[in-house]
UniProtKB/Swiss-Prot annotation:
Matches recorded under InterPro entries: Papain-like_cys_pep_sf (IPR038765), Pept_asp_AS (IPR025661), Pept_cys_AS (IPR000169), Pept_his_AS (IPR025660), Peptidase_C1A (IPR013128), Peptidase_C1A_C (IPR000668), Peptidase_C1A_papain-like (IPR039417), Prot_inhib_I29 (IPR013201)
GO biological process: immune response; positive regulation of apoptotic signaling pathway; proteolysis involved in protein catabolic process
Any one Gene Ontology cellular component term annotated for this protein: extracellular space
Protein name: Cysteine proteinase 6
One Pfam entry name: Inhibitor_I29
Length: 434
């Protein structure tokens, strides 16, 4: 399983856009990908998914030969179209062009740093996974709340708080549970509610349920939040210097769908049509960005296992979903593998995955690929970068992007709208709780 996972990424790294792959090469790559992701198809569905996989593989190969700082790979989304990806994993784009981001009364002080990484400071909890619930907004809000509480406590006592409480209990503020919501509305709920429970006491279920808030299990209390000046990356940097900050982005492009490593640079992104809530935990610049997982974040020895499947239908802003199974892997770029089966189509392997393209059957085929990668997927998490970047925490599990993170372009005209609708909360020190 580990070999097969690295294999798929290797193949797209060594192929060139001008190389015409044979049908057998496509088929072998697809077979290996199916095994790595435990994909199962009916015989009727196989050909359709195979053709989509080939088109996506061609897109990835062509992109990776352009010399972009963004590296793409055959991840969990390799057998679905971009239309399916957007309909299933992202919400209806929220038009933020006329949105009035009114700051709350509290204003933070401080000076903007040249670079910051709140993971290294211990203010970021491990990567989480929203599963089949369109609750990215709640994960973004809890991430910012967790960081704010840690900082308010004097850089101590990092506590994971409950996304499920926000999903179940903040409906009266305008949020729609697993159907979507806004981070600012989540902050308002936490402030007025007098706190939010710990994740351990109110665990995530990936469904909208009856509110079960218990004030005896509070893990964080907020006093206020501040909105970033819409569109201002310099103001966003000033806020991120103060702590992890909730941001909304356009994640609809195929390049985001297949993101693997490097700085994400996509001029086609919209700065106003936003469909995904994430967390900015830092920023940096230079020719070599070291993004190793340090204290406050969950480490993993591989960035490209991509063992993940999901299914959801969301229709509101900031809603999208996915489900992943995290695993540890080794990044060897010279691997070979063989898969065997008979009569029908499957990716045989341990465990199981259910999703929008699941079915049944088995597959046969064998392949052996070897080569070297210059895409920058090293075990230490060091990725070639060229320019300024935001360090962004996603909620699609460890098997997406760089151990669950993405480096997004910074100071490129608010690319993907990262500064259009951003906000940061301020917490009450635990010593001052009632």
């Amino acid at each position: 399983m580990k070999v097969l996972s690295a294999l798929c990424v290797l193949l797209v790294s060594v192929a060139t856009a001008k190389q015409q792959l044979s049908e057998l090469q496509y088929r072998n790559a697809f077979t290996n990908w199916m095994i790595a992701h435990q994909r199962h198809y009916s015989s009727e569905e196989f050909n359709g998914r195979f053709n989509i996989f080939k088109a996506n593989m061609d897109y990835i190969n062509e992109w990776n030969t352009k010399g972009s700082e963004t590296v793409l790979g055959l991840n969990v989304f390799a057998d679905i179209t971009n239309e399916e990806y957007r309909a299933t994993y992202l919400g209806t784009p929220f038009d933020a062009s006329s949105l009035e981001m009114t700051p709350s009364e509290k204003v933070f002080g401080g000076v903007q740093a040249n670079s910051v990484d709140w993971r290294a400071k211990g203010a970021v909890t491990p990567i989480k996974n929203q599963g089949e619930c369109g609750g990215c907004w709640s994960f973004s809000a809890t991430g910012a709340t967790e960081g704010a509480q840690y900082i308010a406590n004097g850089d101590s006592d990092l506590t994971s708080v409950s996304e499920q409480q926000l999903i179940d209990c903040s409906g009266s503020y305008g949020n729609n549970g697993c159907e979507g919501g806004l981070m600012t509305l989540a902050f308002e709920y936490i402030i007025n509610n007098g706190g939010i429970d710990t994740e351990s006491s109110y665990p995530f279920t990936a469904n909208t349920e009856k509110c079960k808030y218990n004030p005896s299990n509070i893990g964080a209390e907020l006093s206020s939040y501040v909105n970033v000046t819409s569109g201002s990356e310099s103001d966003l940097a000033a806020k991120v210097t103060q702590g992890p900050t909730s941001v909304a982005i356009d994640a609809s492009q195929p390049s985001f769908q297949f993101y693997s490593s490097g700085i994400y640079n996509e001029p086609a992104c919209s700065s106003t049509q936003l469909d995904h809530g994430v967390l900015a935990v830092g920023f940096g610049s230079g020719s070599s960005g070291s993004q190793s997982q340090s204290a406050g974040s969950q480490s993993q020895s591989s960035n490209n296992n991509w063992s993940e499947s999901s299914q959801s239908q969301d229709s509101n802003s900031w809603s999208q979903s996915s489900q992943s199974q995290s695993s540890q892997d080794s990044n060897s770029w010279s691997q070979s593998s063989q898969s065997q089966g008979s009569n029908s189509f499957t990716g045989a392997g341990t465990g199981s995955g259910s999703g929008s393209v699941s079915g049944s059957g088995s597959a046969s085929g064998s392949s052996s690929f070897s080569g070297s990668s210059n895409g920058g997927n090293s075990n230490s998490g060091d990725y070639p970068t060229d320019g300024n970047y935001w360090i962004v925490k996603n909620s699609w599990g460890l098997d997406w992007g760089i151990n669950g993170y993405i480096l997004m372009s910074k100071d490129k005209d608010n690319q993907c709208g990262i500064a259009t609708m951003a906000s940061i909360p301020q917490a009450i020190p635990k010593s001052k709780w009632n």
